[in-house]
Amino acid sequence: MKQNKYDQLFFDLDHTIWDFDTNSEATLLDLYHELKLNEQATADFHHFHTTYHHHNEIYWERFRKGYINREELRWKRMWRTLVDYKITDESLAKLMSERYLEILPTKTNLFANCIEVLEYLKAKEYPMHLITNGFEITQHQKIKNSGIDRFFTHVITSEQAGIMKPHAAIFEYALNLTKSTASQCVMIGD
């Protein structure tokens, strides 16, 4: 076995390997057409996407701080976007949320050269793992559908660990899981 400087490599998934912004925008565009939001909200998808992105950031921050739960995050970001277009249909917001979470993990855009880098590191026999704040089921679907599941020994989600990055406890959880010390590991992303 080849001796490596680090015993374990940890990666973030979204915004590091999996191109969240591209995949999310493509998902929202699918929803925009599927639910005919161009007729109900605005004919300008770019404006609709910008509005959604604004509310999504606000609701994720509220979720990270513990002000709202997972279910509220999922549908209220959609509802608040619709409200900006004078649509107060809660059932539509909940449908959007369901469909968004169904469609998003089917998108497979990765950042450039990710596969090549992961293949190189695997050939060097680095044990690789993911630490992600995403939802358990959704993250595993993204990984499988993108064909990168073969690279990672452990997928550690905030939902599984019970704590979100950047809190130290999620990294301690990962170290315990891999039986490593911080000096033996490197975190890539976030």
Residue map of PLM features:
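Glycine-rich phosphate-binding loop signature in dinucleotide/nucleotide-binding domains
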Residues: 2-4, 123-126, 177-184
